């Protein structure tokens, strides 16, 4: 049973992120987020509308690539890459979300610029197995 809940919650987050960030279907995206979504992100205004308005203001070239995703109970954490949003560097993000009644209700994130091969002290990429060109 716990595996089913975790799998369903991971699938919900992946579908929500793809619908909002990649497909940019705002009407469909609304069904994934509570209208009263609590945002702990420094980049997003309160509520679902704050998130939708932020994305509407970004270039249509915005893309999100999910990486590792972990779920425990009502929480999902996904490590991903945002690109094409108008800055010269990509962002690597760890997003943590709480799910209630099949909707995303709370969001936290940690975001940083993606390191290049030249700037990586470890010599390892921050996302995936290879550095982006």
Roles of regions detected by a PLM:
Residues 1-133:
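C-terminal and inter-domain tail/linker signature
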């Amino acid at each position: 049973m716990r595996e089913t809940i975790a799998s369903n919650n991971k699938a919900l987050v992946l579908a929500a992120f793809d619908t909002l960030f990649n497909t940019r279907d705002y009407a469909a995206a609304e069904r994934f987020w509570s209208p009263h979504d609590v945002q702990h992100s420094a980049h997003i205004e309160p509520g679902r509308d704050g998130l939708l308005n932020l994305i509407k203001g970004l270039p249509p070239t915005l893309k999100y690539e999910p990486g590792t995703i972990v779920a425990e109970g009502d929480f999902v954490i996904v490590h991903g890459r945002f690109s094409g949003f108008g800055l010269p560097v990509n962002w690597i993000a760890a997003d943590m979300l709480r799910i209630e009644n099949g909707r995303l209700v709370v969001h936290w994130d940690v975001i940083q610029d993606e390191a290049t091969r030249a700037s990586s002290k470890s010599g390892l990429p921050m996302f995936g197995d290879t550095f982006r060109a």
